[in-house]
A protein has these predicted regions:
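Conserved SAM/AdoMet-binding glycine-rich loop
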Residues: 81-87, 92, 97, 102, ...
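Conserved, mostly hydrophobic/aromatic
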Residues: 173, 190, 226, 254, ...
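Terminal RNA-binding accessory module
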Residues: 336-435
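Proteins enriched for Cys/Gly/acidic motifs involved in redox and nucleic-acid/cofactor modification
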Residues: 2-198, 237, 252, 275-285, ...
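Active-site proximal loops enriched in glycine and acidic residues that flank catalytic Cys/His/Asp
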Residues: 192, 228, 256-258, 294-298, ...
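Glycine-centered loop/turn positions within well-structured domains
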Residues: 114, 151, 196, 261-262, ...
């Protein structure tokens, strides 16, 4: 018979790295059953498109909806045969979206995307469940160890979208690490909605320290970096693991949200100002050289000027190595939406956000300047114009500072580690030369 041309499927991923991991698993499955798969096309390239959406806060939802509408239009114009939508937005608003955007052939939630294979007339290959088609540079990968969150923070819709915390079995995670190492991955960004809860459901205790140790034992794992920890009931055994293991980056991404007891209580964070300061002190004492990344929130209902002053003082005092901040966005279905009035005007929220970030910008600049003259181990991510661009163990991809190294006579290899002397810095990035 006539040779069937392989159909191309575009996968478009919006939102966080946890979503990206789902897309990578789906891509591997689609390739296995004979499709040609592309990732993150700006506009439809293939015959079929799958959009993996984000449902986090206002802006992210808008971005997802705009992307769906753009592809829906392409379908109407005949340049796209099939359009499928999955992920957090459709998990949350499945019925509404189906009514609003009828051009979409089918909406899947966050967990039932495997059905897409059947709907395309193919089978889901269960034996490949740890395999992925990486969309990141091939020397690093995100490693998702659990899904969902049992915390009940006032403002957060993530538990509504993702459901209860479900840890992946440790052996399965370790198999995935070995699979990725065999394909050249050296650096693992360990991610979850909430890392510190890992293991409680499966093993009846917090198992993050043990999991990290076991990943650290696997030959070929050069860097392990931890993302999204929760401050209450922190598994302090992790300090020892970070201190003892060379391949565990001295880096912790821990969202603290606020510092005033009034706000922490209203946010239902189950932690106090005193405990927060103590945890930071413990981190710095127990893990010399640790770099802390945090995320803070301004404008949550009930935040007074005094609360905000306390938050600014906190940022000045602690001098976080990395910091992000959000203005409160009311999310339907959350405790805050039901119980509190979203009373702080948008312009006040924005002003507080700007003020906090500008304080941090100064601190970041000073901390970067302190690195000048130091020798650091750097992994090279890419070549851009006149610079090789890399990161130290204190920098996670996409969000953190980078190290820029001028192209010299000697070509550097993407994905290799080099010893670099830091020769200069600006508010954000470092400039280095190969030693």
């Amino acid at each position: 018979g006539e040779c069937m041309k392989r159909k191309t499927i575009d996968i478009i991923t919006l939102g966080c790295s946890k979503n990206l991991v789902d897309s990578e698993h789906l891509m591997r499955q689609l390739e296995e059953v004979g499709f040609h798969v592309t990732h993150d096309a700006e506009r439809p390239k293939g015959q079929i498109a799958v959009i993996n959406t984000c449902g986090f806060i206002g802006d992210a939802k808008e971005e997802s909806i705009n992307m769906i509408l753009e592809f829906a239009q392409a379908k109407e114009e005949g340049s796209l045969e099939k359009l499928y939508v999955m992920g957090c937005l459709s998990e949350r608003y499945l019925k509404e979206l189906a009514v609003e955007i009828p051009q979409v052939d089918k909406f899947y939630g966050k967990f039932n995307w495997r059905e897409l294979l059947q709907d395309l007339g193919k089978a889901y290959h269960d034996e490949l469940h740890i395999e992925r088609t990486l969309t990141t540079p091939k020397h690093y990968a995100y490693l998702k160890i659990s899904e969902g969150c049992d915390r009940k923070c006032s403002y957060c819709a993530i538990p509504i979208i993702t459901g209860r915390h479900v840890s992946r079995p440790m052996e399965e995670i370790l198999d995935e690490v070995k699979y990725l190492v065999a394909r050249g991955v050296k650096e693992f960004q360990v991610i979850a909605q909430e890392l510190t809860y890992y293991g409680v459901d499966l093993y009846k205790k917090q198992m993050l320290p043990e999991l990290v140790e076991r990943i650290s034992d696997i030959p070929g794992v050069e860097w392990i970096r931890l993302h999204y920890a929760y401050p209450a009931h922190f598994p302090t055994d992790l300090f020892r693991v970070m201190r003892e293991r060379d391949n565990v980056c001295k880096y912790m991404d821990i969202a603290l949200q606020h510092i005033s007891d009034n706000m922490l209580q209203k946010m239902r964070r189950h932690v106090t100002k005193g405990e927060t300061y103590k945890l930071i002190e413990q981190f710095r004492e127990e893990v010399p050289g640790i770099h802390l990344r945090t995320t803070l929130m301004v404008g949550h209902p009930g935040e007074t000027e005094a609360d905000f002053e306390e938050l600014k003082e906190f940022v000045c005092k602690v001098r976080f190595d990395r910091m992000g901040a959000f203005a409160y966005s009311e999310e339907e279905g959350t405790y805050a939406a039901a119980e509190y009035e979203d009373s702080i005007p948008q312009e006040v929220k924005q002003a507080r956000l700007d003020e906090l970030m500008s304080i941090q910008q100064g601190i970041s600049g000073e901390l970067s300047a302190e690195k000048v003259g130091r020798q650091m181990k750097v992994i090279i991510d890419r070549l851009e114009g006149e610079y090789y661009i890399g990161r130290t163990e204190f920098d996670s991809p996409e969000v953190d500072p980078e190290v820029l190294i001028e192209r010299g006579d000697k070509a550097l290899h993407i994905g290799n580690f080099y010893h670099v002397e830091i020769v200069n810095s600006d508010d954000f990035d470092l400039f280095g030369r190969i030693i």
